[in-house]
Curated annotation (Swiss-Prot):
Disruption of the gene: reported phenotype: Leads to increased sensitivity to terbinafine, 4-nitroquinoline N-oxide, and ethidium bromide. Leads to a reduction in infecting activity, characterized by low growth on human nails. Impairs the MDR4 induction when the fungus is challenged with amphotericin B or terbinafine.
Biased composition (Basic and acidic residues): 1-20, 31-41
Name assigned to this protein: ABC multidrug transporter MDR2
PANTHER family per the UniProt record, alphabetical: ATP-BINDING CASSETTE SUB-FAMILY B MEMBER 10, MITOCHONDRIAL, ATP-DEPENDENT PERMEASE MDL1, MITOCHONDRIAL
Gene: MDR2
Amino acid sequence: MVEVSEKPNTQDDGVSKQENRNPASSSSSTSDKEKVAKKGNSDATKSSTPEDLDAQLAHLPEHEREILKQQLFIPDAKATYGTLFRYATRNDMIFLAIVSLASIAAGAALPLFTVLFGSLAGTFRDIALHRITYDEFNSILTRNSLYFVYLGIAQFILLYVSTVGFIYVGEHITQKIRAKYLHAILRQNIGFFDKLGAGEVTTRITADTNLIQDGISEKVGLTLTALSTFFSAFIIGYVRYWKLALICSSTIVAMILVMGGISRFVVKSGRMTLVSYGEGGTVAEEVISSIRNATAFGTQEKLARQYEVHLKEARKWGRRLQMMLGIMFGSMMAIMYSNYGLGFWMGSRFLVGGETDLSAIVNILLAIVIGSFSIGNVAPNTQAFASAISAGAKIFSTIDRVSAIDPGSDEGDTIENVEGTIEFRGIKHIYPSRPEVVVMEDINLVVPKGKTTALVGPSGSGKSTVVGLLERFYNPVSGSVLLDGRDIKTLNLRWLRQQISLVSQEPTLFGTTIFENIRLGLIGSPMENESEEQIKERIVSAAKEANAHDFIMGLPDGYATDVGQRGFLLSGGQKQRIAIARAIVSDPKILLLDEATSALDTKSEGVVQAALDAASRGRTTIVIAHRLSTIKSADNIVVIVGGRIAEQGTHDELVDKKGTYLQLVEAQKINEERGEESEDEAVLEKEKEISRQISVPAKSVNSGKYPDEDVEANLGRIDTKKSLSSVILSQKRSQEKETEYSLGTLIRFIAGFNKPERLIMLCGFFFAVLSGAGQPVQSVFFAKGITTLSLPPSLYGKLREDANFWSLMFLMLGLVQLVTQSAQGVIFAICSESLIYRARSKSFRAMLRQDIAFFDLPENSTGALTSFLSTETKHLSGVSGATLGTILMVSTTLIVALTVALAFGWKLALVCISTVPVLLLCGFYRFWILAQFQTRAKKAYESSASYACEATSSIRTVASLTREQGVMEIYEGQLNDQAKKSLRSVAKSSLLYAASQSFSFFCLALGFWYGGGLLGKGEYNAFQFFLCISCVIFGSQSAGIVFSFSPDMGKAKSAAADFKRLFDRVPTIDIESPDGEKLETVEGTIEFRDVHFRYPTRPEQPVLRGLNLTVKPGQYIALVGPSGCGKSTTIALVERFYDTLSGGVYIDGKDISRLNVNSYRSHLALVSQEPTLYQGTIRDNVLLGVDRDDVPDEQVFAACKAANIYDFIMSLPDGFGTVVGSKGSMLSGGQKQRIAIARALIRDPKVLLLDEATSALDSESEKVVQAALDAAAKGRTTIAVAHRLSTIQKADIIYVFDQGRIVESGTHHELLQNKGRYYELVHMQSLEKTQ
């Protein structure tokens, strides 16, 4: 928790100035809101330059500025392509060298074919001039055809080694980058995370590392092969006749100029796209992790629009990126075709001049054709390399950052025997993320060894800052913290944190079992290496001490129960007790309790507090508490106000002083009307408690009878109910099994995303067809050129004339290709980025449409869904944009080329076409294998990404437990598992890819052998032969290129199926459904009629067992009872987060399941136990309470005044325009809660639901806010869940829950007189002076 110092007593003139300033700025247009949203996120994610930081911190003294800069500065890493391989091992580099050589050798195979071609051309001329016999000709032809076969076999082996090798090394290196990035993240100081959203970490560790992997894997091999082909071709050309080769080499210069000029813009656009997606990922992570809040307030539309702000920015830069690549590719094709024309023109002059012969010219021209064509294959890969460099820059900037407070460092001393005396000496503290606010000023405090020191005071006064400084989450700007007289800066940080156990206000559990969560408390302690049996005993003992053992054993799987992501499957109190058990299991020297019992009910709190009191003995304990009943026995109570110590002493001393502490006590004092209880009465009450546990529960006020008339029948009913509900829930789960979709269905589904671009997409298809037809046309020109150069010396005049004509035709073809390729690139850039934008936007909206049960499923964790949004949408573009255009283009090339070949020489064409089905079969089989591989790989990476996201979003808990090494071991284990699984799939798919590429040589061998025979017999002339061979070469190559897109298509198919499943999933409780009655007005009668409920993820665990409850209009009722008894579940059912298994919830006599869910929820407002704020300004967060934008400032101000937050907001430099940070990280818990209350009040609800609404507030704020809530409750039906009983003593009826039933009800006074369960709870919270 990051606290901000408040100034509640702002003078009137200061407030009026703020009011005059703020409304104008806060009444913003949509574009202004987008700017604020962008600002809020960009502030959180951009690398801060030293100049930026100096400007932000200019008002501070130099030494303070330096301390804050160390905690904030993020270096702006300049990545080059070489830096992507920085984590390659020696073995990786050796392997890379081998596979690079294989790629280069594979690339040299095609130019070697031109040597054979030139030789055969000479042989053809010889037989035409009758210089050799037909048998000699046939022998030479057969031998050269066999050379083609040998070349094909060699290329198959070389390509296979290259593809498998590069994919393996790429995955291996990327695996290390993922691990290094997470390792670097876990070593950062907490100030770094105040600037960084957990969603950005997920985006970096999934989408960005995938981009790096894409840029260093098989695309490197393909590029090396293409470059090798290019250079080999030109080397052969220079050897044959250097003058012509030199002239044709101008191609290289032109291409380098084009690529160099455009790639600068490509890299910048790629970087900006990644930044925008990172910011969007942070918003998505915030929203999904707080989905209950978004659902309760119906803010899905507003939050989706906030997400779209960043998607639009990413779309803008993405379009620029794709357009530049399209223009670059078009320019390169134009240069290539122009070069053909230049070659023919100059070649004809050299031939006529007698400087060279036909064989050399044919060899050189064909080498130039192949070499120039191959360079075209490099262009599509440059985008992958550029994206990899951009992604690398973002990732390496974090990896290279030297943390100011590094938990992974071995530096620093240790103290052999820690006594535990803590001293804060002259402390001044400023949070790095909010440098304009001083949180602590001149704090001097000694915490004696073995004593308990309590810190109390208003929210934001600096209490939790004490914990942050002692744990070294932050460094103070001046002063020092000492442990046993040693400045903690000189101590080893990991060792220091292992001496301290922390239980924080919002308990964080990890997505594993209860046993493993408690075991985490043993990290770094001597007990960590004990036997499993001893560890088990310690864990059970700690759970018993924390009053957690009984509820754990009540769970079906006991200690082996998985708690879900962040412990969502447990109630707040249950999570808190497990966190306490985790803290005390290692018997620490220093215990920090930051609101450690805030989430517990009074009964649990009493037991746990006794356990904590016992655990505190003999160790140094610092307790931060708002609930003063928990700290009255402390050895020293320190009252902190405004970042300074106001007073300190024992409970009695401070009460006698009649100062600030007494005011806090009075604010929280419960008005009990009872006499002193004798010791005998206490014994009697204990006996009553025991008898109550085995007898019939107390009468329910509303039912008029005992809920369970017969105990045996009741037990039987529960058993039956369990079976029935388990069947119902298992049926619901089975209905959600993965649906399989046909390829056609998925293609239609993806095409739907580009529906608005249909017309321009048709234009794109038109240009793609024109581009594709270019190569077969070039084949005609090429054959005509060869035929022209074959003319005898007597026709040299005609030769020069024809050569000029065909050279000009090549130039014209180049210009046409420039236009068509560039136009195609621009059009598909628009379509592709629009598809990605809509896919992300609609899938995010589809997620927000789902009911809460969807998010409870383990596979739908925040990390998994955020990763899905960032990664799978990118995969979806594998069948759109540049990929789709290229596939259509090469398909056209294949069809037109084969058609032309059939038209001019059907015999030779048919023989060559017979090989095409084999190529298609290889390609499609590879496509199918990759689709299967992608499905498996995606799940593995989702799992590891989800785990990384969970760890980073709980960084304070990870840091305080020194769990960094454990997190890394699990994460690296997940990555290793995925690498092993992928290798076999890669081996299969690469086999087929190599086959599909090398088959073109076998096709050429067959074509030359059969076509040469036809030529030798005189059936075909030179034009027919060269045309058919040229068409088949490029046609079959085009088929191979189509299948090089198989990985992208495989990913797209898998992603499309996931999207279709998400879009097709219609939730049971559907916010988009128009069905159900809409309520215009509501009186506010709420009824529960025999409600039974179990959570869908835990069908064997009953939560509510026949609940009957009636709340009359305008009535204020309170729900109290032990943790896990069903109080918060009751609130969830009123909100209709879930539907009941049996029975019903009614409003004004109408079953809420038959009402329109949006209309119904519009009459409710919820304030939860853990407040949720989103990226953006304070004003934006308050306005999330209403579904319209035209809310006057006065209404916003009124809601904030009612929630006692207005004065604090106006004291901030930017007032209502203050950016709250990721998840409200810039504010303290109390400040966040009051903004959440303001958000509820601006809604003006008829039914107000308060789930621990004031649990995060100090006594002073609580009193004012409670009064505001009491006033707000007038005329409204209010249901309040409370552990702190002082907040609900004025309730009209208080219902005491136990095990899903009401066991007692009445007013505060009636229940006190009954001296039952409620009476005990009140007694435990008594704030009377200790005797």
